[in-house]
Amino acid sequence: DCMIALTSPRVQALLSQHNISLDSMLCKNVPEEVSVGVVNGKVTLSSASQTAAGQVLVVNGKLMITPDAAEVLQKYACILVNGMIYCPQCLSAVVSARCILNGKLAVYPDDAVLLPGSSIKLDNTFLLRAQSRLYWNEHRFLAVDSRLDTAALAAKGCSFSAPKAILCASLAP
């Protein structure tokens, strides 16, 4: 029993000559001399990432993909992820075609600043470092501090993207 079995045509021929039962969630054919990289935790793929063509990448955790990573993604023979993939909208089709995912795919706007965490609190401390950017969180933004200077936040040109936003009544338009 195994989660993932990497085989080659030669290995499959050898297995078929014997009474062997392979119980796996996924059986993937790869070239005979393929290099396999395993990451337990978090890895980021960007244009600066170095990889040999035809490599297999196994990620147990989080795979963060930046909008400039298209060429790097094409170099991998296969990417297997047990966990989470964070992917920009512009690469979602490539990621769907090149990656095998046992978990969740979170697609974010290409130009967004990713803010990690289960929720992002918008307060005057956030306002101090805010820029004219689109901020994204996979869960929610919280604007529940009635002292938040929403006019100053709007003047900075901030915008937000998340499935949910929770606002206190005094901040609602």
What is the role of each PLM region?
Residues 142, 160, 165-166:
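N-terminal, charged amphipathic alpha-helical interaction modules
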Residues 9-21, 25-36, 42-56, 65-79, ...:
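Short, T/G/N/S-enriched strand-turn elements that build extracellular solenoid repeat scaffolds
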